[in-house]
Amino acid sequence: MQKEEAKELIKSLVEKINQWNYEYYQLNKPSVSDLEYDKALLELEKLEKEHPDLILSNSPTFRIGSFASEKFTKFVYQKPMLSLAKAYNYDDINSFINNISKIVPTENINFNIEPKIDGLSIALRYKQGKLVKAATRGDGSEGEDVTENIYQIKSIPKLINYFNDLEVRGEVFITKNDFKKINESNNFANARNAASGTLRQLDANIVAERNLSAFLYEIVEPEKHGIYYQHEALEFMKNLDFPTNPFSKVVEIEELEESISDFAEIKNKLDYDADGLVIKLNDLQMWDKLGKTSKFPKHSIAFKYDVEVASSRITDILTSVGRTGKITYIANILPVLLNQTTVKAATLHNHNFIKDMNININDEVNIIKAGEIIPKVISLKEEKNYVDYYKKATNCPSCGSQLVEFEGIVDQFCTNDECPDKNINNIYHFASRNCLNIVGLGLSTVKDFYPKFIKNIKDIFDLHKYRAELIKLPRYRDLKVDNILNSIESAKNKKFSKVIFALGIKHIGQRAAKLIADNYANFAELLDDHNLLKLQNTKNIGPKIIESLIEFISSPANQDLLAFLDAIFNYEGKAKVISTILSGYTFVITGVLSEPRSHFVKLIEEHSGNVSSAISSKTSYLLAGSDAGSKLEKAYKTGTKVINEEQFYDLIKQ
């Protein structure tokens, strides 16, 4: 695009989006859909990135929300009330995770997710346990004081059993049922407009009549209240009788895709409008460290669902089996265009879904592609007035074994340890990028090598014995095979936590694997800990994880595998514990010391201490060398004890 053309387009988009913002925030009468607005804003952001010299001073990319209305007293925020960046597909989510992982170790990353309510953002301030101020977001720096109107919302507590100064933030909305009642005598375009218009009424009696609802989701400066994780913040608010969203939950990185996909199915069944899913880094201590742009924090993102739905006819229904043995039903459909891609198959999840939806071959069904991840059937195009659903599978599609069902679980399972598809998927998971990252050993390669050269995880490490045969296979030459074999050899130096995660044990994601590895140096130590007593006293390790791990290590075959892995792996970076003198202490290391940082990390871990990258309220000591810089300044400001090398050595000699 020529520069003049870009200049004109930027000017046009700025004018158009600013007008839409005025209609949305001030008039509560949007003239375009969220999708059209988002696409225009994305186009403007792209153009401004390509032509930074053409950015206009009134560009909406710099503004959060809208200016506060003149009808209300202004409310100035000490901490800006930012909006959230948006993700439209899983590539956007991956970029978000990758940016976080530049600051936060991957194994320490998990997320709190909750529905993105289509309402009006608010902040509530409490002093001595009493609600004293309430405001709308406005432009993020300055909002509208709507305290009297907030007092009319029944679910928001006016008095709380907590007497420190507290600011919480959330969303005011109107349920679908209440919106229907309101619109019997009004003409609001949607529930969001009704909520916004109601909260900005000058007559508080009207607010009381319209029965607004609210969910609270954030505590400002949580560390002042001894809160360090988002799930703790929600629990804290819930215990003070603040309304919090019951769909909020903590998920690991590897669970995000499924969670996004699952929410697409239920969001329209909720009694309020939810136009997306908010994904927040659970570790609040890292929020400030990750920073923000002028509009968005980098610790959170809002996943927006494209509402495009396609219809097609089911030509066949098949089953597949994953690495855990879980059976998934898949609908083959007549090819249909959805989100600019041709879709030929869509998931039906499990047989309960098929039965509940009354779905069979030859039915016309509606399909979505949730976040451009997994196409899925969501409903029949037209309901049938008779019962006609596809029969339940009885045998595994891979090995033919009888399928098993467990009480309280809707899925069916193949429990045959020799099932080819289960084993192939297990081997692939073990070698995948987030596990041992064995380059070249992808799914198609595992299928090529199975079962002649690889039948299980142990066989991966014997592949070198078959090099002469492997290089004779179609598509496998010397260099390709050697790269795989070299990558297998390198994998033997991975962290213990990576190996734990690679085993694919139920309920054990990357974060749980890291917590397990923090307690044990190898599998032998883990097996020696009767009933996993160490883990039972470990924060964020729940009974489901312990139960699943005990079940896994109780199998003689798995015990044999774990002993084998211990024998061939030289686990990276795990210090052998020689004393507990530093147990319960957290160190931050900064400046130039007489030995490399790794030397001191090893010593701290050997004596049962922890090492952190940033000073927080949990930091016990700052070990400082010369040229310590900003961390030393922060330590003095926060009252963190500062020690030098000599004092550190004195500590571990005690």
Curated annotation (Swiss-Prot):
It comes from the Bacteria. DNA ligase that catalyzes the formation of phosphodiester linkages between 5'-phosphoryl and 3'-hydroxyl groups in double-stranded DNA using NAD as a coenzyme and as the energy source for the reaction. It is essential for DNA replication and repair of damaged DNA. GO terms for molecular function: DNA ligase (NAD+) activity; metal ion binding. CDD domains: LIGANc (cd00114). Its cofactor is Mg(2+); Mn(2+). NAD(+) binds at D34, L35, E36, Y37, D38, S83, L84, E114, R137, E171, K280, K304. Belongs to the NAD-dependent DNA ligase family. LigA subfamily. The keyword Zinc applies. The keyword Metal-binding applies. Keywords: DNA damage, DNA repair, DNA replication, Ligase, Magnesium, Manganese, Metal-binding, NAD, Zinc. SUPFAM superfamilies: BRCT domain (SSF52113), DNA ligase/mRNA capping enzyme, catalytic domain (SSF56091), Nucleic acid-binding proteins (SSF50249), RuvA domain 2-like (SSF47781). It is an enzyme of class 6 (ligase). It comes from Mycoplasmopsis agalactiae (strain NCTC 10123 / CIP 59.7 / PG2). Zn(2+) binds at C396, C399, C414, C419. Residues 577-654 form the BRCT domain. PANTHER family: CHROMOSOME TRANSMISSION FIDELITY FACTOR 18 (PTHR23389), DNA LIGASE (PTHR23389:SF9). The active site is at K116 (n6-amp-lysine intermediate). The lineage of its organism: Bacteria, Bacillati, Mycoplasmatota, Mycoplasmoidales, Metamycoplasmataceae. One of its GO terms (biological process) is DNA replication. One of its GO terms (cellular component) is cytosol. It catalyses: NAD(+) + (deoxyribonucleotide)n-3'-hydroxyl + 5'-phospho-(deoxyribonucleotide)m = (deoxyribonucleotide)n+m + AMP + beta-nicotinamide D-nucleotide. Its EC number is 6.5.1.2. This is DNA ligase.
